[in-house]
Structures are given as C-alpha cells and as structure tokens.
C-alpha cells in the first residue's frame, strides 16, 4: 500500500526535464557529455559535431596526452606488463625510466599486503555476495588502519592512493574467496600476494585455487587494467563525489 502511494505521488513528468533543461545522466539533449570540470590526466575522443549533429568516430583514449595505443605498443613490444607504468604516468604526468619503474614496482610490492587483521575484520567476518559492496566496505574499514586518515595534504593523499592501487586487487580477490566459501560452499583459499609479480599476475594467482595462470591470461588482464586505469577525469561517479 505504501509503495503504491510512493508511485502515485513521486512521479515526475519526463517533459519537465526538457522544460527546465535538466542534464539527465550528465548528458545534453544531443547526447554529448556535460562539461563539469577540467583535467590534464585523461581524455576520450568518441565523436565529432557536424552541422550540430553528434557523429560517432573511431574512439581514441589518451593518458596525459599519450595515445593509449602507443602506450600499449611500447610495453607489449618489450614484453612487460603495462599497468604499473600506466599508474605512474597517470599520477606523475610522465612515463618512468627503467630504474624508476623498478623502484615503483618495488614500492607497489611493499604495499600489497593488507594490514594485520584487516582481511579478518573487513572481509572474512562479514562476507558479502556482492563483490563491489565488499570492496566499498573494505575501503571504509581502511580508515581505521590509516595513521592519518583525515589529512588532505598531497603527501598523505599520494600515500593513500598508492596503497589503494596496490591493495585493490588483493581486496577484490579476498572478497571473492570469502563469497565462494561462505555463500557457494567452496574451500577457503587466501594466499599472500607475491613480490616480483605484476598486479595482473598477483590477482590471477590470488583468485585461483591452484594459483596457476597462463602468460596470455596475465597479458590480457594487464591490458584490461590499463584500459580501465583512468576513471576519474570527469565521469559521473567523480562528478558526484566532487559535488557531495
């Protein structure tokens, strides 16, 4: 009965959105995106305006002004994973040299392990059926383990960002393992991440009961991580965060 009342009194005439020029879904009436900010980190070219009409074109993705096609060609030609150097590029605005990449990979290695007791309190004791929900809760729990969670200076924000980059795959894998055990009746298998492995390799190792994966699987996952690495330059989620 109450639900019917809500349906009857909470409906908004769709024509009002056009009348008041409301940007539904952060889209203009012609389907183009609403400009809500400026960024030099990532950009996407997916259409052009011809005679006031939006015309689709072959999509292009740029990170810090570098075409992702060129970025991928570089690390795949040298047969190395690319997500780590892509993260470096997005954060610092330039590609790392050989020595800098080694240091960066080493830093991510040292940050992958979760704090003592974290997986028990944040994941195992409250296993969820929805992995995204589990990840969101784990990030909130990370507040309790951060030595300076409320500081907003660049150094603190960078430290937190690096920790999240390193630990997100571990949290996601552990959340899946907890779901598989408590909700799907499977054995619980939680390994520690290994140093010397890429982000993609560690994720696959943590997800598999036997810890095994093929080079092709690692390469494909690494490529997926590269293509999804920049998701904060002006998308709906980031806009909502800025507004709130």
For every predicted segment, state its role:
Residues 1-244:
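Hydrophobic alpha-helical bundle cores within soluble ligand-binding/oligomerization subdomains
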């Amino acid at each position: 009965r109450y639900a019917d009342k809500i349906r009857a009194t909470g409906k908004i005439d769709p024509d009002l959105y056009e009348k008041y020029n409301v940007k539904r879904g952060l889209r203009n009436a012609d389907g183009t995106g609403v400009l809500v900010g400026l960024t030099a980190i990532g950009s996407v070219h997916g259409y052009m305006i011809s005679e006031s009409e939006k015309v689709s074109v072959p999509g292009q993705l740029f990170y810090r002004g570098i075409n992702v096609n060129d970025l991928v060609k570089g690390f795949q030609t040298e047969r190395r994973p690319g997500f780590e150097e892509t993260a470096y590029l997005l954060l610092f605005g330039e590609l790392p040299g050989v020595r800098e990449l080694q240091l960066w990979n080493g830093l991510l290695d040292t940050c992958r392990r979760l704090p003592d007791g974290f997986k028990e309190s944040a994941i195992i004791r409250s296993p969820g059926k929805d992995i995204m929900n589990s990840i969101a809760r784990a990030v909130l729990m990370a507040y309790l383990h951060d030595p300076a969670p409320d500081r907003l200076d660049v150094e603190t924000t960078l430290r937190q960002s690096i920790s999240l980059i390193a630990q997100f795959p571990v949290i996601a894998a552990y959340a899946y393992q907890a779901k598989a055990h408590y909700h799907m009746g499977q054995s619980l298998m939680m390994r520690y991440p290994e140093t010397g492995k890429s982000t993609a390799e560690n994720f696959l190792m943590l997800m598999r009961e036997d810890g095994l994966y093929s080079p092709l699987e690692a390469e494909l996952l690494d490529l997926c991580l590269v293509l999804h690495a920049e998701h904060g330059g002006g998308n709906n989620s980031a806009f909502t965060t800025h507004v709130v």
